[in-house]
Structure formats: structure tokens, C-alpha cells
């Protein structure tokens, strides 16, 4: 099982990739690529013994990525998602609209704004890493929310709902209050934009 990375915003013309539980396109790998050697250099000292590229019995290259902060490893054990590291070098800036944005340990940020269960927009998004939502709370607001830099933050009451598989949801805000009912995230089945639907296809 791989990780399909897709564009997740309609506000920024540069494609942004997001990790969801999908198969990777043939010939690609969900891990350390030549285009992001700076990121690898930044992250590797923190988790040399927990990350790396290895060959599985079938000969496929797999990459294990864990939380870049050792101090959070125990607290978030099993919750860090594999990151789409290869997207950083060629997929344009993150959603802070800075042309010099880079994906690194000090820039990890995942912010949501939910209102009565509906996502009202995403201030910024970084695909690596984000804690999984507890399995018993899929489709519900999660007590495990986001990581800013290397510090865990406490979720506000409107912390984000979860996508199927336990991924935090980050959906564009509804165009108006009148259409919010049809574009709210509900139990992992409804998305406000086709680009957010798991399985919609990988960006080449």
C-alpha cells in the first residue's frame, strides 16, 4: 500500500500534494527523492534509527518516515503519517503564498478552521507529518490535531474532522453559507472539492 499525493487547494495555482491511503503511480516512490536532499539532511539526524529506505521481499523500495521530533516519538507513536517529501522541491510554495517556502522541520504546520463540524478553510498545509485521528473518532472531531514546528499544540473545540483512514481533513471553505450543508465534511464521505476526494488520481 502506498501513498497517493494530490493537489489539495483551489486557492493556490501551484499543485500541492497531500498524502492519502492510495496506491502510488507505477514507477514512483513515496519517499526520499533526489529533489529534496536538503529536507533529508534536515530530518535524518533526528530519526536515523527509525527512518530509511529498504528493499522488501518483492523488491519494491519502501520508505519509513516518522515524526522529526524525537521528543514527540513516544507521545505520537504510531500516529505520524508517511510524508510526500518529493513534492517539496517541484510542487511550488505551501499555502502561505511565499515563493520561498520550504518543507522542513521548522515549517511543519497544519491549520484548520472548522465551524459546527464544517471546515471553513485551511490557513496553511504541510503534508509531513500529521497525526492520525483515533480510529474510533473517524468522521468526528479529533483530540489529536496538529504539530506546529516541533511542539504539539492543544486543539481548540473546533479541531478538524478526520478523513477515512484517520487523516485530518483540510477542505476549502464553502463558497457561501447557503451551500455549506452540501460541502461540509460528514463522516468521511463528503468533500467540498473534487480534488479532496481520496482516489481522485495522482498528479503527474
From Swiss-Prot:
Q: In which tissues is it expressed?
A: Not detected in any tissue tested.
Q: Cellular component GO terms, alphabetically? A: endoplasmic reticulum
What is the recorded name of this protein? Uncharacterized protein encoded by LINC01547
Which residue stretches does the UniProt record annotate as biased composition, category Basic and acidic residues?
41-57
Region feature (Disordered): 1-73
Biological classification of the source: Eukaryota, Metazoa, Chordata, Craniata, Vertebrata
Q: Where is the composition biased (Polar residues)?
A: 60-70
Gene name for this UniProt entry: LINC01547
Amino acid at each position: 500500500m502506498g501513498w497517493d499525493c494530490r493537489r489539495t487547494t483551489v486557492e493556490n495555482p501551484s499543485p500541492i500534494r497531500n498524502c492519502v491511503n492510495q496506491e502510488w503511480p507505477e514507477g514512483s516512490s513515496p519517499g526520499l527523492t533526489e529533489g529534496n536532499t536538503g529536507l533529508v539532511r534536515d530530518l535524518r539526524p533526528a530519526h536515523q534509527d527509525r527512518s530509511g529506505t529498504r528493499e522488501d521481499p518483492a523488491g519494491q523500495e519502501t520508505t519509513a518516515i516518522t515524526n522529526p521530533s524525537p521528543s514527540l516519538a513516544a507521545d505520537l507513536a504510531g500516529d505520524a503519517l508517511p510524508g510526500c517529501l518529493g513534492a517539496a522541491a517541484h510542487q511550488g510554495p505551501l499555502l502561505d503564498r511565499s515563493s520561498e517556502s520550504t518543507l522542513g522541520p521548522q515549517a511543519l504546520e497544519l491549520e484548520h478552521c472548522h465551524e459546527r463540524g464544517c471546515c471553513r478553510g485551511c490557513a496553511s498545509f504541510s503534508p509531513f507529518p500529521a497525526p492520525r485521528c483515533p480510529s474510533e473518532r473517524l468522521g468526528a472531531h479529533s483530540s489529536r490535531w496538529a504539530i506546529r514546528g516541533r511542539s504539539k499544540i492543544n486543539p481548540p473545540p473546533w479541531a478538524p474532522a478526520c478523513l477515512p483512514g484517520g487523516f485530518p481533513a483540510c477542505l476549502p471553505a464553502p463558497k457561501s453559507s447557503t451551500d455549506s450543508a452540501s460541502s461540509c465534511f460528514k463522516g468521511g464521505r463528503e468533500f467540498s472539492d473534487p480534488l479532496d476526494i481520496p482516489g481522485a488520481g495522482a498528479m503527474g
